[in-house]
């Protein structure tokens, strides 16, 4: 049984978004470690990722079939909805020393050139500030291994220079941001 607050929140969710909430969480705040939170993400980025899943430029056993029946308008509505939600999940305890090392690595690799200061993102560049720690690690490893390549090679190129320690430190830093 849903609480009154949860029922009210669900009533405001676009019909097509209801299926998304099972993995991406209430209002787009994922509680699943390897699933990204969508709350507060750039609408353009969300739309492009949905389109990439649908058109086969990005592959995921769950997301590819989930996007199959979506129209352009559906994807735009979902992107708008999730971009307007507030990112609230902060459950990972970051290590301050690793955060410092992550800041240094982010500065060294010029992350802010694309992701902007404090990883706020812009347009088709994702906001990764406050993203799930495990998802950041997974994503960086996927780019490094070239298992994910729907970004014109930008992140693949950057991730190829990262060590396991660098990835861990960057994930601590990114997870520490709001």
Q: What residue ranges belong to the model's regions?
A:
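Gly/Gly-Pro-rich "capping" loops immediately C-terminal to redox-active cysteine motifs
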Residues: 28-58, 64-70, 107, 119-145, ...
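C-terminal capping alpha-helices of c-type cytochrome domains
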Residues: 68-90, 134, 160-178
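Inter-heme linker and motif-flanking segments adjacent to c-type heme-binding CXXCH motifs
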Residues: 29-30, 84-97, 118-126, 144-152, ...
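Hydrophobic alpha-helical segments typical of transmembrane helices
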Residues: 16, 45, 49, 62, ...
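C-terminal segment of classical bacterial N-terminal signal peptides
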Residues: 1-9
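Sequence/structural segment immediately N-terminal to covalent heme-attachment motifs in c-type
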Residues: 9-29, 90, 94-117, 132
């Amino acid at each position: 049984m849903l609480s009154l607050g949860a029922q009210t929140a669900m009533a405001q969710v676009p019909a097509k978004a209801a299926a998304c909430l099972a993995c991406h969480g209430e209002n787009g705040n994922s509680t699943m470690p390897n699933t990204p939170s969508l709350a507060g993400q750039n609408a353009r980025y969300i739309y492009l990722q949905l389109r990439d899943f649908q058109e086969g430029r990005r592959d995921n056993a769950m997301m590819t079939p989930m996007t199959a029946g979506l129209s352009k308008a559906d994807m735009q509505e979902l992107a708008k909805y999730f971009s307007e939600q507030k990112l609230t999940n902060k459950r990972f305890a970051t290590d301050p020393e690793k955060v410092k090392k992550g800041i240094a690595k982010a500065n060294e690799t010029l992350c802010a050139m694309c992701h902007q200061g404090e990883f706020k993102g812009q347009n088709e560049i994702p906001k990764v500030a406050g993203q799930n720690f495990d998802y950041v690690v997974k994503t960086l490893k996927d780019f490094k291994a070239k298992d994910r390549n729907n970004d014109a090679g930008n992140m693949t190129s950057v991730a190829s220079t990262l060590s396991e320690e660098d990835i861990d430190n960057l994930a601590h830093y990114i997870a520490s941001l709001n």
